[in-house]
């Protein structure tokens, strides 16, 4: 919601004719997608349609080979950028199954990540105060900051941990891959509220989901339906109603 005042929108991401292959098998077959600041884009599609492949290609996962087309971030072609460079530039991706990092405390991990992204070393006292506030909003006990990243975390705790990373790092482009997967109703609401708190006129969000519950507090500006590596339909959030009613067979 932009309010009554006109907001100047900035192009965050522009994908042109993107083809992506995995092990020489073409998964994406000509994707065009433009995302501006302040926008929330939802990507839906049956399993194997190419949703996660798209996010991994944007994040420069080396398993996913861009064979044709271009990815522009803030007007700059990033085809040759490494994953690390994209992350430092403000591109964030959550995962369906977040990895555990034994030996690295969550609080230390977030403080170091924030330093790398911002280029500034945050005050420990100020950082810890802000971290506690964000953890409280996600109903995570502050003791989690001293636990190793995702080690022994339940599925719900791992997803909340990723939203904590999102809110702490405050990236320009957030890509959330089935963040609601495996969560109970209460956890979905907490995660949904966390995403809503992050959204602003200065950033943009791509959400992959099969369920509308995650979007309970989030207004989707565009919904895209993928099938066989192509975007076949783009519309408003009424497309989600159609999917819930008819499934993907009509696509």
What residue spans do the PLM features occupy?
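The feature captures the beta-strand-to-loop junction immediately N-terminal to the Walker
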Residues: 44-46
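Conserved structural motif at the start of ABC-family nucleotide-binding domains
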Residues: 13-15, 28-30, 35
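Walker B catalytic motif
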Residues: 178-179, 186
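Helix-to-loop junction immediately C-terminal to a conserved catalytic motif
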Residues: 59
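ABC ATPase NBD Q-loop/coupling interface
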Residues: 70-86, 150
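ABC-family P-loop ATPase nucleotide-binding domains
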Residues: 99-172
């Amino acid at each position: 919601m932009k309010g009554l005042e006109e907001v100047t929108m900035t192009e965050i991401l522009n994908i042109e004719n993107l083809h992506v292959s995995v092990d020489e098998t073409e998964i994406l077959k000509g994707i065009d997608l433009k995302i501006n600041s302040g926008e929330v884009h939802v990507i839906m599609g049956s399993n194997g349609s190419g949703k996660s492949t798209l996010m991994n290609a944007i994040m420069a996962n080396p398993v996913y080979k861009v064979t044709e087309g271009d990815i522009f971030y803030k007007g700059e072609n990033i085809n040759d950028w490494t994953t690390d460079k994209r992350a430092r530039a403000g591109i964030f991706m959550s995962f369906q199954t977040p990895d555990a990092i034994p030996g690295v405390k969550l609080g230390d991990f977030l403080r170091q990540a924030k330093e790398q992204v911002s280029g500034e070393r945050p005050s420990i006292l100020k950082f810890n105060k802000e971290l506690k506030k964000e953890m409280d909003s996600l109903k995570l006990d502050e003791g989690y900051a001293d636990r190793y990243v995702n080690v022994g975390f339940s599925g719900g705790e791992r997803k909340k941990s990723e939203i904590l990373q999102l809110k702490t790092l405050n990236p320009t482009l957030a890509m959330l891959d089935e963040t609601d997967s495996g969560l109970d109703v209460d956890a979905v609401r907490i995660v949904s509220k966390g995403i809503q708190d992050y959204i602003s006129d200065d950033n943009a969000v791509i959400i992959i989901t099969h369920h509308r519950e995650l979007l309970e507090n989030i207004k989707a500006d565009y919904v895209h339906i993928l099938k066989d590596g192509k975007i076949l339909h783009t519309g408003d959030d009424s497309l989600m109603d159609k999917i819930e009613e008819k499934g993907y067979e009509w696509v």
